[in-house]
């Protein structure tokens, strides 16, 4: 009896040992991701992955990861700086932010004797759209040329700060004496604009569009006018990436799927962002929909590499850092290339593609495919899940009047700037009607005035353009 008890104890001990050894091998891998939910062009790197549980689909469970458990953690931030602090402190593994704060992230890691790497672009513009300057809605200021001697607020050391400095330099002004630049977060600046405590505010995505959409500001300058590339992307702790390269690739495959889902149904996911963040779906669609302000281009185009170089040099000029970053090693596209390969995509083909998210649609009235996008106008009606597409502004405005007379209400109307191709809120644009009755939209009144002289047209606002379109249809 005693012998059997000893044997049982030995077997039990053996079993406990094997369990203990197994537990030692069953590593728990933390995947701690910092997001910026309200910075909506980071959505495919955080918010959508989290809300749609996309990461779980790609985390590896074979090979050395066979017995691994994952501790996926999400933490939301309103800017890049506090996210960088937590990454350097070892509390986060991934973080999404813009080129300027991302460069500060790399500098902070380097000062700490460590390294972070930029692994993907999430959204950007090779011309600089996304950053912008707004003024109070009732301001007499019409362009940046009117800002000399004025007070302009901006979040310091941001991509918008860099844009503002470039815009001021292009005017031939001294930023220290010709304008009064103060630092303000977008939350503070919104109230300051309403109270007319500042003359203008420069900011990053989505505020140069969000404030005008909410009716208390008007955009007078788009970052595309600087022709200086800007982007948001994702960084990872380099040591983490070396230890768990397959996890980094898994995250990037989730980014790719989020990007594809957004392309398939931009209205649906624009509304999901609104549900989570409170940022209006109409603003989200302006960026993420077809022909949007930015492209959700994940690849490391030369322009985005140059944007990082510019960010580093500007931050040194502003005395925000004294660190020299080697962009050739700071940006690492190896993980993204592998994620593309595993997703069945051609990275090099995507790298060569500079097109905006395409609009593949028929004119809602004629049923014919839209092929000329210079005058495309989109109407999103209350109660409708999809945006209506029109080949011309005059057709869309006339149809909108009819719809409104029938009790329908537009959530938003989008037009394309004839000069730049930028997507605009229709009620924020200036319009020129030529002798043939064609209506063209412009962000800047100066551009509208010049075009009006060329075509012997008149410059009008949105309300007048709608009236003109309706009268033209009635006269046929």
Task: List PLM regions with ranges.
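Sec/Tat signal peptide C-region and signal peptidase I cleavage site
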Residues: 19-26
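Secondary-structure end/capping motifs
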Residues: 37-40, 244-322
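A bilobed periplasmic-binding-protein/Venus flytrap-type ligand-binding module shared by bacterial periplasmic
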Residues: 49, 130-140, 230-246, 432-434
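Short, glycine-/small- and polar/acidic-enriched structural segments
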Residues: 27-174, 180-183, 199, 228
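Short cysteine-rich clusters marking metal-coordination/redox-active sites
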Residues: 362-367
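Conserved C-terminal helix/tail region of periplasmic/extracytoplasmic solute-binding proteins
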Residues: 316-360
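Ligand-binding clefts/hinges and TM-proximal coupling segments of bilobed small-molecule sensing domains
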Residues: 66-68, 151, 155-166, 171, ...
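Pocket-lining segment of extracytoplasmic ligand-binding domains
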Residues: 110, 176, 182, 187-276, ...
């Amino acid at each position: 009896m005693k012998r059997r008890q000893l044997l049982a104890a030995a077997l039990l001990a053996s079993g406990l040992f094997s369990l203990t050894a197994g537990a030692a091998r069953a590593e728990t891998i933390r995947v701690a991701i910092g997001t910026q939910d309200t910075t909506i062009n980071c959505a495919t790197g955080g918010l959508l992955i989290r809300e749609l549980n996309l990461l779980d689909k790609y985390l590896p469970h074979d090979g050395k990861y066979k017995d691994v458990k994952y501790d996926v953690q999400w933490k939301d931030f309103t800017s890049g700086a506090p996210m960088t602090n937590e990454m350097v402190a070892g509390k986060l593994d991934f973080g999404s932010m813009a080129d300027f704060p991302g460069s500060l992230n790399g500098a902070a890691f380097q000062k700490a004797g460590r390294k972070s790497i930029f692994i993907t672009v999430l959204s950007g513009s090779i011309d600089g759209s996304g950053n912008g300057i707004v003024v109070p809605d009732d301001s007499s200021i019409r362009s940046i040329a009117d800002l000399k001697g004025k007070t302009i607020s901006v979040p310091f050391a941001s991509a918008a700060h860099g844009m503002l400095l470039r815009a001021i330099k292009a005017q031939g002004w001294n930023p220290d004496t010709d304008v009064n630049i103060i630092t303000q977060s977008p939350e503070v600046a919104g109230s300051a604009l309403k109270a007319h405590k500042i003359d203008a505010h420069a900011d990053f995505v989505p505020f140069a569009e969000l404030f005008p959409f909410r009716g208390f500001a008007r955009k007078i300058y788009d970052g595309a006018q600087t022709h200086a590339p800007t982007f948001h992307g994702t960084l990872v702790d380099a040591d983490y990436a070396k230890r768990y390269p397959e996890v980094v690739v898994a995250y990037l495959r989730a980014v790719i799927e989020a990007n594809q889902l957004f392309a398939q149904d931009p209205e649906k996911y624009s509304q999901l962002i609104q549900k989570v963040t409170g940022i209006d779906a109409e603003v989200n669609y302006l960026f993420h929909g077809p022909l949007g302000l930015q492209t959700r281009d994940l690849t490391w185009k030369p322009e985005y590499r140059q944007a990082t170089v510019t960010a580093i040099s500007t931050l040194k000029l502003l005395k925000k850092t004294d660190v020299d970053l080697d962009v050739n090693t700071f940006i690492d596209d190896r993980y993204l290339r592998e994620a593309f390969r595993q997703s069945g995509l051609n990275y090099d083909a995507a790298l060569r593609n500079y097109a905006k998210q395409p609009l593949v649609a028929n004119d809602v009235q004629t049923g014919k495919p839209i092929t000329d996008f210079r005058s495309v106008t989109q109407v999103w009606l209350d109660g409708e899940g999809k945006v209506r597409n029109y080949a011309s502004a005059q057709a869309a405005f006339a149809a909108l009047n009819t719809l409104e007379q029938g009790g329908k209400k537009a959530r938003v109307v989008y037009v394309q700037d004839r000069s730049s191709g930028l997507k605009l809120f229709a009620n924020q644009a200036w319009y020129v009607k030529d002798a043939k009755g064609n209506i063209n939209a412009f962000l800047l009144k100066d551009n509208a005035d010049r075009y009006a002289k060329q075509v012997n047209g008149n410059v009008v606002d949105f309300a007048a353009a709608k009236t003109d379109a309706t009268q033209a249809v009635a006269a046929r």
